[in-house]
Amino acid sequence: MRIVDRESAEGRRERITLVPETLDDLWHLTYVLEPGDLVAGDTTRRIQRDDDKMRDTGGEREPMWIRIDVNNVEFAKFANRLRVGGDIVDCSREDQLGFHHTFNVEEHDELTVEKVWQVDQLERLEEAVEAAEQPDVAIATVEEGQAHIHTVAQYGVEERASITGTTGKGEYARSRDELFEELAAILRRLDAEAIILAGPGFTKQDALEHIEDNAPEAAEKIQVVDTASVGDRGVHEVLKRGAVDRIQTETRVSKEAELIDELMERIGEGEKAAYGVDEVAEAAEFGAIETLLILDERLREERAGEGDWAVDVNDIIENVEQQGGEVVVFSHEFDPGQQLANLGGIAALLRYRLS
């Protein structure tokens, strides 16, 4: 994420002009933007005309500058874009005022966001800016006859390739070198800044030697990790062991896994923990929260007025921060986020037990 400009607006509002540079940045904006925000930028809009030439075509798209009052935000992950919809409140063409418009925000599109910024939202922007300097990580898990390549992004872990084939004897057997060469070719194409090579047994070491001989530029980026499995399970082992953390100073994935494990351990032992909005709100009032854990989707719903909590989520967050606590927003894309969802979407590690 790149911040282009910041300036004060009316009331407690602030206007920030920014440029999302990666798919991760678009994902971050999903949880920054909310109904009532003002979003502006250059876009195109289909204009209906009355002349005979255009009547049958449904109008043509014209470039214009538009500001909307946001009422809908959707991250279209597989389309690589963020859809931000709302009513037009300012426009370079006055005849478009009041109509609905949707920005299809893609990487490198500049937009200006005006709103009352919550502390956690500004922290999320800062996280996105800092993430631009962190290395991308590819995880290749390998065992005899198969290899899987995943990438770790802030919005989730994504499988990028799966290679399978018989590597035994026989006319139709696929040689190990052939499988290793395809693995090396994929890693070259991904051009990740760091690679973790994992799996059971000695196959990964043989794969590393092949990559060192045939793709030395990729081999320089590799760290080897022992795991009992490959594929999704192998990736989970890599994340849980903190291998990604050693490459990226701090990743959302590994931090959330560590925190949710600590929470579940404390709950199981009846230690300093709270979960569910009622328990957490009470703990926040007493200043007992050391770390607040909240699910991104639940936070968005509550702020948009779509949730069912009887307390204001912003009050909980402000109480925690005023008492020196940490707020961690979990991604629903990861397993730890799913575990948190099962606990009501909000929980806390406490400084002391309340009862």
UniProtKB/Swiss-Prot annotation:
Q: Per the record, what about its domains?
A: The N-terminal domain has the RNA-binding Sm fold. It harbors the endoribonuclease activity.
Q: Which domain of life is it from?
A: Archaea
Its main localization is: cytoplasm
Recorded GO MF terms: endonuclease activity; metal ion binding
Cofactor entry: a divalent metal cation
Gene from which this protein is expressed = pelA
Please provide the Gene Ontology terms (biological process) for this protein. Answer: nonfunctional rRNA decay; nuclear-transcribed mRNA catabolic process, no-go decay; nuclear-transcribed mRNA catabolic process, non-stop decay; ribosome disassembly; RNA surveillance
Q: Which UniProt keywords apply?
A: Cytoplasm, Endonuclease, Hydrolase, Metal-binding, Nuclease
Family indicated by similarity: Belongs to the eukaryotic release factor 1 family. Pelota subfamily.
Q: Does the keyword Ribosomal protein apply?
A: no
What cellular-component terms does GO give this entry?
Answer: cytoplasm
What's the protein name?
Protein pelota homolog
EC numbers, comma separated: 3.1.-.-
Where's it found, cell-wise? Cytoplasm
* Assembly information from the UniProt record: Monomer.
The lineage is:
Archaea, Methanobacteriati, Methanobacteriota, Stenosarchaea group, Halobacteria
According to its UniProt record, this protein's enzyme class is hydrolase
Record carries keyword Transferase: no
Which species is listed as the source?
Natronomonas pharaonis (strain ATCC 35678 / DSM 2160 / CIP 103997 / JCM 8858 / NBRC 14720 / NCIMB 2260 / Gabara) (Halobacterium pharaonis)
The protein's job, in short, is: May function in recognizing stalled ribosomes, interact with stem-loop structures in stalled mRNA molecules, and effect endonucleolytic cleavage of the mRNA. May play a role in the release non-functional ribosomes and degradation of damaged mRNAs. Has endoribonuclease activity.
